[in-house]
A protein has these predicted regions:
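Residue-level signal for inorganic ion chemistry
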Residues: 34, 98, 114, 153, ...
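Catalytic-core segments of class I nucleotidyltransferases/pyrophosphorylases
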Residues: 125-129, 157-246
């Protein structure tokens, strides 16, 4: 299985912390945010190739980090060539570029590099292996305004995703999909087809939504919480939470 971490954003809401330093490498609980995800995946033994896609501004920091990071396979860093938030490619284009440049295809785990989970990704992988579909995660969101900023799912029997809509004005349910995905057979060509077919380029959930209406996709009920670090306040809150755990 391939693993691709999306880390090409500019995290402008965390300035000045992230003006010249990538958000996924900010430290929480004594190590970079991205380390928590990688250290959780490593014991599964399922990752054959691993990549992080970033931008030209942050590529040197990621290359230094990857050279020192212990992981079962080399961590390949892809530079998408952008240098400003205004010229960013968007997560879906970054994913396409990564698969194309590294000649990756097949089973692929895709995740944002700036989220933390309080449960193991091994459970998500087990859920994926138990079926024969693509998979994403889901949690119930009660706050109407937060719902409108999420990827919202419409579900059928057996956790099957009937539809997914990014940032809907009128959410069809309270099921949100965070940026963690498992694809059975992903390729640069499939993503290019999605983009030609009207798939949004910015949010990674746009690709999941496009695929979900064309290929069977199930939604894993999250057994715990995820921590989305989007602002200085949320970063400080997550840091305090992890420090309180010792």
């Amino acid at each position: 299985m391939n693993a691709v971490f999306l880390a090409a954003g500019y995290a402008t809401r965390l300035y000045p912390l992230t003006r010249d330093f990538p958000k996924p490498l900010l430290r929480v609980g004594g190590k970079p945010i991205l380390d928590w995800l990688l250290d959780d995946l490593a014991p599964t033994g399922q990752i054959a190739r691993c990549a992080v896609v970033t931008n030209a501004r942050f590529a040197p920091a990621f290359r230094a980090w990857s050279a020192a990071k212990a992981f079962p396979v080399p961590i390949e860093v892809v530079d998408d060539g952008t240098a400003t938030n205004e010229t960013r490619l968007g997560a879906v284009n970054d994913l396409r570029l990564t698969l194309e440049q590294l000649e990756m295809s097949g089973e692929t785990f895709v995740a944002a590099g700036d989220n933390l989970l309080d449960f193991s990704l091994a459970l998500f992988l087990d859920y994926f292996r138990a079926g024969n579909t693509n998979c994403l995660m889901r949690y119930e969101e009660q706050n109407e305004e937060r719902l409108k900023k999420c990827g919202v799912l419409e579900l059928g029997d057996g956790d099957l995703v009937l539809s997914m809509e990014e940032k809907p004005a009128a959410p069809k349910s309270r099921w949100c999909a965070p940026p963690f995905y498992l694809y059975k057979d992903l390729s640069a060509e499939k993503i290019a087809e999605a983009l030609r077919g009207g798939c949004g380029a910015d949010a990674p959930g746009s690709l999941a939504a496009w695929i979900a209406v064309r290929e069977p996709t199930r939604a894993f009920p999250m057994p715990g919480k995820r921590r989305d670090i989007g602002t200085l306040e949320s970063y400080e809150a997550v840091r305090a939470l992890y420090e309180s755990r010792g």
